[in-house]
Amino acid sequence: MHLAYPAVLSALLFCTGLYGVLARRNAILVLMSVELMLNAVNLNLVAFDVWLSRAAEETLHSGQALTLFTIAIAAAEIGIGLAIVLAVHRNRGTSDIDKLRDTAEGHEPDGPDTDTPATGTAAEKAEATA
């Protein structure tokens, strides 16, 4: 098999994962996109390892060993990441990244701006709302 096929597939997987990280707002979908990017890297590692071992006629397979190590680290990462997302969802009631960022900064995104001073008397405010 030619090296271009897995390299193109790996690039497509990585770009799909990158789009998911940049476009999604749900934390679980972002974690899934990161895993897709890691799998694209693993595919690239294995493809280049096979290609280089055929060219050099060696059977070291260090790329495949590195891929197994990466899979183990990714499994631990997704386990911890999902645990954190579930804990945050239980406490805050949402897993939307933008809403979590706004609540962490201490202000509501849809609320009025509190930096501007109030102008007018109470009678003017009551008249404006009526």
UniProtKB/Swiss-Prot annotation:
The UniProt transmembrane annotation reads 3-23, 28-48, 68-88
Record organism: Streptomyces coelicolor (strain ATCC BAA-471 / A3(2) / M145)
Q: Which reaction does it catalyse?
A: a quinone + NADH + 5 H(+)(in) = a quinol + NAD(+) + 4 H(+)(out)
Q: Does the keyword field hold Ion transport?
A: no
Membrane topology classification: Multi-pass membrane protein
Basic and acidic residues compositional bias, start-end: 97-110
Q: Where is the composition biased (Low complexity)?
A: 114-123
List the Pfam families hit by this protein, alphabetically: Oxidored_q2
User: What protein name does the entry list?
Assistant: NADH-quinone oxidoreductase subunit K 1
Q: Which NCBIfam families match?
A: PRK05715.1-2
User: What superkingdom does the record give?
Assistant: Bacteria
Region (Disordered) location: 97-130
GO CC list? NADH dehydrogenase complex; plasma membrane
Q: Which biological process, per GO, is one annotated for this protein?
A: ATP synthesis coupled electron transport
Q: What does this protein do?
A: NDH-1 shuttles electrons from NADH, via FMN and iron-sulfur (Fe-S) centers, to quinones in the respiratory chain. The immediate electron acceptor for the enzyme in this species is believed to be a menaquinone. Couples the redox reaction to proton translocation (for every two electrons transferred, four hydrogen ions are translocated across the cytoplasmic membrane), and thus conserves the redox energy in a proton gradient.
Q: Which UniProt keywords apply?
A: Cell membrane, Membrane, NAD, Quinone, Translocase, Transmembrane, Transmembrane helix, Transport
* Assembly notes: NDH-1 is composed of 14 different subunits. Subunits NuoA, H, J, K, L, M, N constitute the membrane sector of the complex.
Task: Name any one GO molecular function.
Answer: NADH:ubiquinone reductase (non-electrogenic) activity
Q: Which EC numbers characterise this protein's activity in its record? A: 7.1.1.-
The places in or outside the cell where this protein is found are:
Cell membrane
